[in-house]
A protein has these predicted regions:
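Short, glycine/charged-enriched secondary-structure capping and boundary segments
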Residues: 20-22, 42-45, 88, 115-119
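FAD-binding core/adjacent interface of flavoenzyme oxidoreductases
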Residues: 1-5, 73-139
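Helix N-cap at the beta1-alpha1 junction of Rossmann-like dinucleotide-binding domains, i.e.
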Residues: 34-36
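N-terminal Rossmann-like dinucleotide/flavin-binding domain of flavoprotein oxidoreductases
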Residues: 38-95
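Short glycine-rich loop/turn motifs that provide flexible caps or phosphate-binding loops at active sites
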Residues: 7-12, 47, 54, 105, ...
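Rossmann-like dinucleotide/flavin-binding elements
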Residues: 3-29, 121, 128-153
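A generic "binding-loop/recognition-motif" signal
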Residues: 10, 42, 77, 107-108, ...
């Protein structure tokens, strides 16, 4: 049976895992733990949910569904990738050989160093104006940023 390692357990990683396992591929997801989705307080624009759902709940349900279909999850951070006879994803504790690897590690963003900011993520602090502007309609807001992206807001 062919095998695949998916690095990352966010929406892209879980989606890839679902398709792989349903195609009969031995599927393992390496995750270093909750990512950006976990910090979303309320998601109202996700297909299939009649009521708002938190990012943590959406992540939990997605992983639960993948496990139900046979996807294995390993909590470990990928630190290397090598190829000899097979691809091998390296972690600090173990190596995971596979026929294929998908890197679905998400995006990183530059976060300003403001004391207490991390505790407000998902509770008034947002990093996606297009995603979250609806929640702040009619309210006073402050925008912090620079460069071309800021000019599009």
């Amino acid at each position: 049976m062919p095998s695949i390692i998916i690095v990352g357990s966010g929406p892209a990683g879980i989606s890839a895992a679902l398709y792989a396992v349903r195609a009969g591929v031995d599927t393992t997801v390496l995750t270093k733990g909750p990512g950006a989705l976990d910090r979303a307080e309320k998601i109202e624009n996700y297909y299939g949910f009649a009521e708002p759902v938190s990012g943590a709940e959406l992540e939990r349900r997605s992983i639960e569904n993948a496990k139900r279909l046979g996807v294995r999850f390993v909590t470990a951070e990928a630190v290397g990738l090598t190829y000899t006879d097979k691809l091998t994803v390296e972690t600090m504790d173990k190596n995971y050989p596979a026929d294929a690897v998908i890197l679905a590690t998400g995006a990183s963003r530059a976060v300003p160093r403001i004391p207490g900011l991390a505790g407000l993520e998902g509770h008034g602090v947002s990093y996606c104006a297009a995603c979250d502007a609806f929640f702040y309609r009619g309210k006073d807001v402050a925008v912090l940023g620079s460069g071309e992206y800021l000019s599009l807001i």
